[in-house]
Amino acid sequence: YIEQGNRVLGILGYTEHSRGHAVKVAETAGEILEKLGYNEHTVELAQIAGYMHDMGNCVNRVDHAHSSALMAFQLLREWKFPDEDIAAIVSAIGQHDEQTGTAVDAVSAALILADKTDVRRNRVRNPIKENFDMHDRVNYAAVASSLQVNVEKKVILLEIELDEEICSILDYFE
């Protein structure tokens, strides 16, 4: 489902959403919760949600968070996951899109942070800079980025170096 969604988004001109993105988001979501001291089980829930969060793109980009959550629900039921784990995972997935969702717990917060901080130049598929949309500009402008969790200060910090001739730091936050 992930690769089909990535193909669909490629045809539509969107940034890369392949297994590479899914793995990066899964790893980052897990790392965030691990560093914050959450138990291994909660870390695993965030990793699963991170990996599955965009598979609904194979249905349609519009409302993909909800499609992804419903698809994940079906798969997790088939795999006999406990109901409370399914609920945590699909809730996080369904909440990850900034237009229709919000962080409602640690798993969803970690997923949202991990997804929104995966900014990399190699995610841009559009070769014509003049035709870049906001996502293309932000990703293409990203020279380097790192996400740091400071437990003592209770701060999660994204350090991002942008080529400001391509995109301003304010554009990143739109």
List PLM regions with ranges:
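Inter-helical turn/loop segments and adjacent helix faces that build the functional surface
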Residues: 36, 79-83
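Acidic/His-rich, divalent-metal-binding segments that scaffold phosphate/diphosphate chemistry
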Residues: 1-64, 75
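Short acidic, glycine/proline-enriched loop segments that cap or flank alpha-helices
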Residues: 60-63, 81, 170
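Histidine/acidic-rich helix-loop-helix segments that form or flank divalent-metal centers
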Residues: 82-144
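Charged catalytic carboxylate motif
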Residues: 24, 67, 109
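Terminal helices and disordered tails flanking the catalytic cores of nucleotide-processing hydrolases
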Residues: 121-174
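Post-HEXXH active-site segment of zinc metalloproteases
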Residues: 63-73, 83
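Short alpha-helical catalytic segment bearing the HExxH-like zincin motif
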Residues: 46, 50, 67, 93, ...
